[in-house]
């Protein structure tokens, strides 16, 4: 092993040469084998060289490095560099003195260690045994290398490793690059690639490595990491030819052919420029498989020791050449002008520029082709539209010519006039047909209005009576004078007393009364057009026709024995009755027994009890009509009360219950008349007790009277007045008008057949001061009690109903 001798103030230290080149920032190298336990011992300085040789081993920090915290990753060495010392001993054993002189580095002037890798390479080129693997080119400024399995074995003899990729990386670090032919065509390059598929040519960038020039070897120095990143050329290991055991040497790279290696070294692709970390070289530690097992183990142990002793290697990323930044002046002992004039740099720039321009040309050609296709489609579209425009212009010209011809022709104007005349004639015909139809429809509209008006008049005047139902409503209100009273035909507002009859009273304005059937009337509780009259002051007389009664059958002796009632001289005619009585006095709910016996059978009277009662009533009637009344049956004559007078008046005037024509409805009797309809009318008097009356069995013996009207004030009846004898047994089938005889002081009214005077007669007698003798009330009550005792079957049920009535 060679030794480097360095003088430092008279002291001499021996140290093994380091495999790392000096840094460009003049950081001092360290002795590799002088590692002692004292890591912080001071080291003397050399005044001449300003060189520090410490005894400790600390990794230097390169300030220009990218990773300051971990400087081990920024240093780059190989196992071939570590074995340079052993290679120098081999060369000295072969007898060459130049290698021995070069191994001794005299650093008095330069202060830097001598690089051994260049001398090893130079010795390999002069070795005749391996001249078929590595030899000089004809120009003597470059050399050829044939990579393969045999060349890897030779590398183990000089550098103690078999990695061809590491050998090529060391060449790049010392300024060697692969030679390319940039001015050849693609065909020539393919031919040359086929001829030199297994041969690589390398040349130094500054032409310092030449055959026979050993002095220039001193100028070849190892470059720094910055310079290597800017100028390093990478060879793909995949392009290497396959060996006998390719799996042992497969480290991720292979050389397929020279062209691929040439492309990766000098023409960096776009993907490599974008991701340079993908192409980083790797230094495997795989032993040679052909050696024996013992040798392999020894080599593995040596390699492990070398890895521990050597400095950590610096990875060199594969990136594009960068020429924009300035080159450090201390990196290489060359001037900037010499650096720019290097042929390798020019070749790299030219190759990368050609590659980039070719890529751009491809993109431009593709874009041009696309634009050309679009241009062709637009031309076709333009031609189609142009042809359509020509056709449209031709058609428009033809239409214009036709219009000119038609404008010059007079026959068209005449045809248009004829057409207008025909259309106007048809329109006139349609108008003439439409006018009569409107005139026909016109008379029907007033008729409809008249019908509506008639309907309204009927609905508003439903309580009025007239003989003509289909009268003209326009003449209804012509003869009516303005008056504060509601329209009612029975209100007499004139002084003279007209004859009875609705035609004379109403002058044909209102319809006549319909006494025969009350079911046709639209009954209501109160007239909405008539105000409620006062009960005390209402003394309006109502004119009504004298009712026609059937011939009465009564006893003349009984009529002669009855007392006569004297009436006053101011008695109104018989055709008038009191308004208050007719309006508010509830008339008797029961009619005479003749009506009860002669009424038609109803569905209510189908029970056997009712039939038996009817038979008994008939027998009693026959007995009373045949046998004369006895004197003992005659009751004591007593003056009649006002209620009994009303009851007698109701018996004498049965037509008053059915001949009412005022606005209020007639109260329906308990037993309807035979001529009236079966269904009873609802009004204010029978609405509350309608459900009770429907189930009530009528008794022919019983005669009930309603409460007297309150419009007549009660007057005390004098005891000196003559009495009227009325027998309770006398039951006349019909009533006749009372025989009235007038005298100077009083009027006497003879009541025949047990009939009572009317309310109007009693009222007149009270006004004039005359007295009226009435039958006693006790006899009527006794008679009622007898009837109640005779009909004791239904006394319990009827007693409650009589209280309600």
Swiss-Prot record:
Q: Where is this region: Disordered?
A: 1-110, 273-336, 438-483, 513-675, 691-746, 759-805
Q: Which GO terms describe its molecular function?
A: DNA-binding transcription factor activity; RNA polymerase II-specific DNA-binding transcription factor binding; sequence-specific DNA binding
Keyword set includes Transcription regulation: yes
**Mind telling me which GO cellular component terms the entry cites?**
nuclear chromosome; nucleus
Q: Polar residues bias located where?
A: 25-69, 454-480, 533-556, 581-597, 604-614, 622-635, 716-738
Among InterPro entries, the record links this protein to:
HSF_DNA-bd (IPR000232), WH-like_DNA-bd_sf (IPR036388), WH_DNA-bd_sf (IPR036390)
Q: Which segments cross the bilayer?
A: none
Q: Which domain of life is it from?
A: Eukaryota
GO BP = filamentous growth; filamentous growth of a population of unicellular organisms; flocculation; negative regulation of filamentous growth of a population of unicellular organisms; negative regulation of transcription by RNA polymerase II; quorum sensing
List where Basic and acidic residues composition bias occurs: 71-85
Q: Per its UniProt record, what SUPFAM superfamilies does this chain match? A: Winged helix' DNA-binding domain (SSF46785)
Query: How does gene deletion manifest?
Result: Enhances flocculation, filamentous growth, and hypha-specific gene expression in several media and at several growth temperatures.
Q: Which UniProt keywords apply?
A: DNA-binding, Nucleus, Repressor, Transcription, Transcription regulation, Virulence
Compartments annotated for it: namely:
Nucleus
Bias category Low complexity: which stretches?
A: 1-24, 86-110, 295-310, 557-566, 637-659
Q: Which residues bind DNA?
A: 117-226
- Parts forming coiled coils: none
- UniProt xrefs under PANTHER family: FLOCCULATION SUPPRESSION PROTEIN (PTHR10015:SF396), HEAT SHOCK TRANSCRIPTION FACTOR (PTHR10015)
Function recorded in the entry: Transcription factor that plays a role of repressor of filamentous growth and flocculation. Antagonizes functions of SFL2 and FLO8. Plays a role in the hyphal repression induced by secreted factors like dodecanol by competitors such as Pseudomonas aeruginosa and Burkholderia cenocepacia.
**So what family is this one in?**
Belongs to the HSF family.
Protein name as it appears in the record: Transcription factor SFL1
Species of provenance: Candida albicans (strain SC5314 / ATCC MYA-2876) (Yeast)
Gene name for this UniProt entry: SFL1
């Amino acid at each position: 092993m060679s030794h480097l001798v360095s003088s430092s103030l008279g002291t001499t230290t021996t140290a093994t040469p380091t495999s790392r080149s000096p840094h460009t920032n003049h950081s001092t190298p360290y002795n590799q084998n002088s590692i002692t336990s004292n890591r912080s011992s001071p080291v003397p300085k050399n005044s001449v060289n300003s060189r520090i040789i410490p005894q400790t081993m600390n990794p230097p920090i390169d300030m220009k490095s990218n990773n300051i915290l971990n400087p081990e990753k920024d240093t780059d060495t190989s196992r071939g560099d570590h074995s340079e010392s052993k290679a120098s001993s081999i060369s000295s054993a072969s007898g060459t003195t130049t290698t021995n002189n070069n191994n001794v580095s005299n650093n008095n002037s330069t202060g830097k260690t001598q690089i051994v890798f260049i001398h090893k390479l130079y010795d390999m080129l002069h070795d005749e045994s391996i001249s078929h693997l590595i030899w000089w080119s004809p120009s003597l400024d470059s050399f050829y290398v044939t990579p393969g399995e045999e060349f890897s074995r030779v590398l183990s003899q000089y550098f103690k490793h078999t990695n061809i990729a590491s050998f090529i990386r060391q060449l790049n670090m010392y300024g060697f690059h692969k030679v390319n032919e940039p001015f050849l065509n693609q065909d020539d390059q393919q031919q040359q690639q086929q001829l030199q598929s297994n041969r690589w040519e390398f040349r130094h960038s500054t032409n310092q490595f030449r055959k026979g020039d050993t002095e220039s070897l001193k100028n070849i120095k190892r470059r720094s990491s910055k310079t290597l990143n800017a100028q390093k050329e990478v060879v793909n290991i995949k392009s290497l030819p396959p060996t006998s055991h390719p799996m042992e040497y497969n480290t991720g790279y292979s050389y397929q052919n020279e062209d691929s290696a040439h492309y990766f070294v000098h023409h960096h692709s776009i993907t490599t420029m974008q991701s340079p970390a993908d192409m980083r070289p790797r230094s495997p530690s795989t032993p040679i498989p052909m050696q024996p097992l013992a040798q392999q183990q020894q080599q593995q142990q040596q390699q492990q020791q070398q890895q521990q002793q050597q400095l950590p290697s610096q990875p060199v990323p594969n990136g594009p050449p960068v020429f924009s930044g300035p080159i450090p002046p201390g990196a290489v002992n060359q001037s900037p002008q010499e650096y720019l004039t290097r042929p390798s740099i020019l070749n790299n720039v030219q190759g990368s520029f050609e590659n980039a321009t070719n890529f751009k040309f491809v993109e431009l050609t593709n874009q041009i082709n696309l634009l050309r296709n679009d241009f062709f489609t637009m031309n076709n579209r333009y031609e189609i539209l142009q042809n359509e425009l020509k056709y449209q212009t031709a058609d428009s010209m033809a239409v214009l010519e036709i219009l000119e011809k038609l404008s010059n022709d007079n026959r068209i104007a005449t045809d248009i006039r004829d057409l207008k005349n025909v259309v106007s004639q048809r329109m006139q015909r349609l108008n003439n047909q439409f006018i009569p139809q409107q005139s026909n429809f016109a008379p029907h509209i007033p008729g409809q209005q008249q019908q509506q008006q008639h309907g309204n008049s009927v609905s508003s005047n439903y309580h009025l009576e007239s003989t003509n139902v289909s009268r003209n409503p326009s003449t209804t209100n012509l003869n009516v004078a303005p008056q504060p009273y509601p329209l009612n035909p029975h209100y007499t507002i004139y002084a003279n007393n007209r004859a009875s009859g609705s035609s004379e009273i109403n002058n044909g304005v209102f319809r006549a009364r319909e006494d025969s059937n009350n079911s046709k009337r639209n009954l209501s509780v109160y007239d909405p057009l008539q105000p409620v009259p006062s009960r005390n002051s209402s003394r309006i007389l109502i004119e009504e026709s004298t009712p026609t009664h059937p011939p009465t059958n009564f006893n003349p002796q009984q009529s002669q024995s009855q007392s006569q009632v004297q009436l006053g001289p101011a008695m109104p005619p018989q055709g008038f009755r009191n308004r208050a009585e007719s309006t508010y006095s509830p008339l008797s709910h029961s009619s005479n027994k003749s009506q009860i016996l002669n009424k038609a059978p109803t569905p209510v009277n189908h029970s056997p009890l009712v039939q038996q009662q009817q038979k008994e009533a008939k027998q009693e009637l026959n007995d009373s009509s045949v046998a004369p009344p006895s004197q003992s049956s005659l009751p004591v004559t007593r003056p009649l009360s006002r209620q009994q007078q009303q009851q007698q008046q109701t018996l004498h005037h049965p037509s008053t219950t059915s001949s009412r024509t005022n606005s209020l409805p007639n109260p329906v009797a308990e037993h309807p008349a035979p001529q009236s309809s079966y269904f009873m009318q609802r009004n204010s008097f029978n609405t509350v007790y309608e459900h009770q009356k429907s189930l009530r069995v009528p008794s022919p013996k019983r005669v009930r009277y309603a409460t007297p009207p309150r419009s007549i004030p009660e007057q005390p009846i004098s005891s000196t007045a003559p009495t009227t004898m009325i027998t309770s047994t006398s039951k006349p089938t019909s009533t006749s008008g009372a025989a009235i005889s007038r005298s100077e002081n009083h009027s006497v009214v003879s009541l025949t057949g047990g009939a009572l005077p009317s309310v109007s007669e009693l009222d007149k007698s009270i006004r004039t001061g005359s007295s009226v003798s009435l039958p006693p009330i006790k006899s009527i009550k006794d008679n009622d009690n007898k009837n109640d005792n005779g009909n004791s079957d239904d006394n319990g049920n009827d007693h409650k109903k009589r209280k309600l009535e």
